[in-house]
Amino acid sequence: MTIPAFHPGELNVYSAPGDVADVSRALRLTGRRVMLVPTMGALHEGHLALVRAAKRVPGSVVVVSIFVNPMQFGAGEDLDAYPRTPDDDLAQLRAEGVEIAFTPTTAAMYPDGLRTTVQPGPLAAELEGGPRPTHFAGVLTVVLKLLQIVRPDRVFFGEKDYQQLVLIRQLVADFNLDVAVVGVPTVREADGLAMSSRNRYLDPAQRAAAVALSAALTAAAHAATAGAQAALDAARAVLDAAPGVAVDYLELRDIGLGPMPLNGSGRLLVAARLGTTRLLDNIAIEIGTFAGTDRPDGYRAILESHWRN
């Protein structure tokens, strides 16, 4: 078997699944640790944070996949309108010192169509899955395929899409996949807005209003010592005051996205529309843990953690 050419220290671009699988296998046999960063392209600093986290692993070789997966787009979602910037994406990967880009076509990823797919658990029908009932089946199917093709030691996802991260961890656990799933904190603009490929669609007024999402989460974190309802009320007050922000949901869950206990660690998630653009955000939050007690030294870190999560 002839292994496709691989040039260390350069960006090697492969479009055939078999080629990247062969190169990954050969690199593992030499002792390199393969890291996978799945993306749909239109790369920004949030994606590059995943790349940098992967590169920090000793002995790593980083594979970044760029594939706009049609299976995760539902009815009424315009697949053709999704931003595609392949030349800019590859230039950014070269600048980061990435050695492998995997850029398959739809025909290469699904040569027999959607013959076999992943059926997610009940969580996939909640939150983001409510208005998008087939979305996470598409996400988990393509992630499983990427993991089988690349066979990485670790795979990296951003915490901004927190429900996706939880479902991928369920996939890996339920199918006994030999890979570690690494969640990387959300990267934010200077004013707190979570970085997203969708931000480019906001007009100036919408961009100014969009900061209400992170501001609402901050307000909730400050109010959380008084309990879950106080946290939700504080967040809702900020969102209600923001012009043009239509909230799809604001929910407090436990860290696995089950029901939130009365006290302890949780996740506060928000989705909202500004015009035709839909934005997501979330933070780690501690509910009632320090109510009626002296606040420990680490309390400020909890309140400030949304800038890193």
Curated annotation (Swiss-Prot):
Disruption phenotype: Simultaneous disruption of panD and panC gives a mutant unable to grow in the absence of panothenate. The double mutant has a highly attenuated disease response in BALB/c and SCID mice; immunocompromised BALB/c SCID mice survive on average 36 weeks as opposed to 5 weeks for mice infected with wild-type bacteria, while immunocompetent BALB/c mice survive indefinitely. In wild-type mice bacteria grow for 3 weeks then undergo a steady decline, bacteria persist over 8 months in SCID mice.
EC number: 6.3.2.1
Residues annotated as binding ATP: 40-47, 158-161, 187, 195-198
SUPFAM superfamilies: Nucleotidylyl transferase (SSF52374)
Alphabetical UniProt keywords: Acetylation, ATP-binding, Cytoplasm, Ligase, Magnesium, Metal-binding, Nucleotide-binding, Pantothenate biosynthesis, Virulence
Family indicated by similarity: Belongs to the pantothenate synthetase family.
Protein's UniProt name: Pantothenate synthetase
Binding site for beta-alanine: Q72
